[in-house]
Amino acid sequence: MAQSQSWARRCFKAFCKGFFVAVPVAVTFLDRVACVARVEGSSMQPSLNPGGSQSSDVVLLNHWKVRNFEVQRGDIVSLVSPKNPEQKIIKRVIALEGDIVRTIGHKNRLVKVPRGHMWVEGDHHGHSFDSNSFGPVSLGLLHAHATHILWPPERWQRLESVLPPERCPLQTGEK
């Protein structure tokens, strides 16, 4: 009887040690390095959710890649919605600070992206709530860079940072 209590106590201690090490490591990893997210809606079709409401892609979000707020034109990023801070949205970076972009339905036909901001759009222009609705987005709202589609298995692929040719900035802020 004493041996079984001793064995149970050792198992419990081992579990607790593992638990109290694994949980902080997992939380730190998910907060600072990477996590997964389900993409809802049609705003990023055909890149994400090409099947519409019948399926939802699950993507890998890399936090580490945007830790210094460094993004490139064409990157698909997750960001805090400028209109609803409780919500995260996934969009494509179209323009960076200093770029001049031709808008689609924005109050100004041309917009120069201010310092510390980016212009983001969904790939499905008629069905996207993006910078054409709310203007340039602060880099401070950047959450992660979407790097891979993980689900469904038949769509597993790396997400390329490709800027649609018709959405290239008219003038870039690069020197």
From Swiss-Prot:
Compartments (UniProt record): Mitochondrion inner membrane
EC number from the UniProt entry: 3.4.21.-
Single annotated GO MF: serine-type endopeptidase activity
Pfam families given in the database record: Peptidase_S26 (PF10502)
Active site: S43, K91
Record InterPro entries: IMP2, LexA/Signal_pep-like_sf, Pept_S26A_signal_pept_1, Pept_S26A_signal_pept_1_CS, Peptidase_S26
A biological process term (GO) from this entry: DNA damage response
Alphabetical keyword list: Hydrolase, Membrane, Mitochondrion, Mitochondrion inner membrane, Protease, Transmembrane, Transmembrane helix
Membrane spanning stretches: 19-37
GO cellular component, one term: mitochondrial inner membrane
Membrane-topology descriptor: Single-pass membrane protein
Family membership: Belongs to the peptidase S26 family. IMP2 subfamily.
Functional note: Catalyzes the removal of transit peptides required for the targeting of proteins from the mitochondrial matrix, across the inner membrane, into the inter-membrane space. Known to process the nuclear encoded protein DIABLO.
Subunit text: Heterodimer of 2 subunits, IMMPL1 and IMMPL2.
UniProt protein name: Mitochondrial inner membrane protease subunit 2
This protein's encoding gene: Immp2l
